[in-house]
Amino acid sequence: MTHETPPPSYNDVMLQMFHDHSVFLHQENLSPRTINSTSSSEIKNVRRRGTFIILACLIISVILCLILILHIFNVRYGGTKP
């Protein structure tokens, strides 16, 4: 009589993946000296670039919404009247 082990559950697989990922992250050379060697100007540049991208997307979205609203208003109320 042989006992077969049941396949691992979904939770077991996810926990193992999370554990493996955590171990991988901690194996990288992330000593405090390495983290502090990143200059504050580099961090500011990354933040500034991210902020610029977000603002650009918001401005484009607002412009497209205004164009859509004006188009709907023009179609509904600005049609040629006899």
From Swiss-Prot:
CC per GO annotation: membrane
Q: Which UniProt keywords apply?
A: Membrane, Transmembrane, Transmembrane helix
Q: How does it sit in the membrane?
A: Single-pass membrane protein
Which coarse location class describes where this protein primarily resides? membrane
Q: Which residues cross the membrane?
A: 52-72
Q: Where is this motif: PPXY motif?
A: 7-10
Q: Where in the cell is it found?
A: Membrane
> What is said about its interaction partners and assembly?
Interacts with host ITCH; this interaction probably mediates ITCH degradation. Interacts probably with NEDD4.
- Domain comment? Late-budding domains (L domains) are short sequence motifs essential for viral particle budding. They recruit proteins of the host ESCRT machinery (Endosomal Sorting Complex Required for Transport) or ESCRT-associated proteins. Contains one L domain: a PPXY motif which is involved in the interaction with Itch, a member of the Nedd4 family.
**Task of the protein:** Down-regulates of the TCR/CD3E complex and the transferrin receptor TFRC in host T-cells by blocking them from recycling back to the cell surface.
Q: What is this protein called?
A: U24 protein
User: Which organism was this protein described from?
Assistant: Human herpesvirus 7 (strain JI)
- UniProt lists the gene as U24
